A protein has these predicted regions:
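Membrane-water interface at transmembrane helix exits
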Residues: 29-34, 58-66, 87, 91, ...
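Beta-strand/loop substructures that line and gate deep hydrophobic ligand-binding cavities in soluble
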Residues: 69-78, 82-88, 93-100, 238-290, ...
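Aromatic-acidic/polar surface patches that form glycan- and anion
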Residues: 159, 209, 289, 293
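Hydrophobic ligand-binding cavity/cleft-lining segments
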Residues: 2-44, 48-56, 76-82, 86, ...
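Glycine-rich portal/gate segments that line the openings of hydrophobic small-molecule binding cavities
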Residues: 4-14, 26, 30-75, 105-106, ...
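A short, structured loop/turn motif at beta-sheet edges
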Residues: 159-164, 221-228, 254-264, 301-307
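A conserved amphipathic terminal alpha-helix motif
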Residues: 102-128, 271-307
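Short capping loops/turns at secondary-structure boundaries
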Residues: 97-104, 148
Length: 307
């Protein structure tokens, strides 16, 4: 059985129908979310309920097949690959965003498949209907619910220069020429390359320019030379990657004179996630925001310490 190709109708339907169902349901969530004023994002229903339903549906089609453990994993992995491709082509999701969500999708597809195998072996129609009905109710309730998760990330660096020399490089800096180290940046996630300003005062406009050409519009809300630069995010492009599911709210750079010719710079970002479960996506969001800080502050350190 291990080396047999996928040939039977039931095998093929186990791939086709779950993915048609998934794309249809997710498209509906996008439609309903717009009507209730939600930003675009991945919700609990999309990354947990839909994959579980996919697994259950596949289990029904494959219920009379004696699949080995390896083939079971392969089939469900293939289902996730098909779903990922459809998400990119039909829903316009970015490749890195799909990469981030894929482990979670595979996990819940496998859980759904295990639930389906148990249900259909028992042939308990009433119980089967109750489980699917419960998942449907949760799906609808989650789709119509508000989804927001706010967090803040702060990072520090010590620069061998006084605040007065560093300040101008904090407010605006020339293009970063060094290639990024962070692996997500290296495979295509937009990374910061430069910052420009329209003036050196409160209320001035500031732009953080990314490698893809996108620019985040900012307005300086606090301008204390050598001490505090705080800015509000006023415009953010809807990039198909992570930026489509994360709103940057505010940024800040605090400079502390250490009294020995060095300065401690603290970079802070406030952001809001529109993807759930938040605990999973925030692990990625924190890492991405932190690496944005590191890339920018390392550049500030390099040009500030240059003689």
């Amino acid at each position: 059985m291990e080396n047999q190709p996928i040939t039977t109708d039931k095998e093929i339907l186990g791939f086709i129908t779950p993915n048609i169902m998934a794309i249809t349901l997710i498209a509906l969530t996008k439609t309903f979310s717009v009507h209730v004023g939600e930003a675009d994002g991945f919700y609990f229903s999309e990354v947990i309920i839909v994959p579980i339903l996919m697994g259950i549906m596949s289990a029904w089609h494959w219920r009379n097949m004696e699949l080995t453990t390896r083939r079971t994993w392969f089939y469900n992995f293939l289902n996730c690959v098909i779903a990922a491709m459809l998400s990119g082509f039909v829903l316009g999701e970015g490749s890195i965003c799909i990469l981030i969500v894929s482990p979670l999708i595979l996990c819940f597809v496998m859980i759904g498949y295990a639930i389906g195998r148990a249900l259909f072996k028992k042939n308990n129609t009433g119980f089967n209907i109750s489980v699917v009905s419960l998942l449907t109710v949760v799906f609808i309730a989650d789709t119509l619910s508000k989804h927001e998760y706010n967090n803040v990330v702060a990072d520090t660096i010590v620069i061998n220069a006084p605040p007065a020399k560093i300040w101008k490089n904090v407010v605006a800096f020339k293009p970063i020429k060094q290639q990024p180290d962070f692996w997500l940046f290296r495979i295509g996630l937009p990374n910061p390359t430069a910052a420009t300003v329209t003036g050196y005062h409160e209320g001035a406009g500031r732009k953080c320019i990314f490698s893809t050409g996108y620019a985040i519009g900012e307005r300086i809300s606090t301008y204390e030379p050598g001490k505090n630069l705080t800015f509000d995010i006023i415009d953010q492009p809807r990039d198909p990657e992570m930026m489509n599911h994360l709103d940057l709210l505010k940024g800040q750079f605090l400079l502390k004179d250490n009294g020995n010719g060095t300065t401690t710079v603290t970079g802070t970002r406030w952001y809001r996630l529109h993807v759930f479960p938040a605990w999973y996506y925030d692990l990625w969001a924190q890492s991405i925001v932190r690496n944005v800080h590191i890339r920018v502050m390392q550049h500030i350190k390099e040009i500030s310490e240059a003689k």
